[in-house]
Amino acid sequence: MKTFDGRALATSSNEALRTRLEQNTADGLITAPVVIAQGLSDIVVPPSATDAYVEERCSAGQRLEYWTFAGRDHFTIVQPGAPLEELLIRWTMARFANEPQASGCVHKSF
């Protein structure tokens, strides 16, 4: 993990933080509907880290939707009016309407 100036945040010199970040990873199957959104220009949570997490979760049998957004970063992905806003509202409304989530792992690019 890196900070905005490029220095690593979770380094061996910050072992307590690195250990806590590793512990703070969901590794059990989640029975509720799951969607993960990732800005492809994100430098706070790099897309490669989310890709690896999604791949690991899918290999473990987790059902989820993984949405990636070109040109969006950690902050612009959630700005009012960003594409995620309407997509997430529609996705959530569908879940409350008891419409099933897509089966397996589905990756959509926006």
What are these regions (language model features)?
Residues 1-27:
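Accessory cap/linker subdomain of secreted extracellular hydrolases
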Residues 18-19, 51-110:
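C-terminal catalytic histidine-bearing segment of alpha/beta-hydrolase fold enzymes
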Residues 40-45, 75:
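Acidic catalytic loop of the alpha/beta-hydrolase fold
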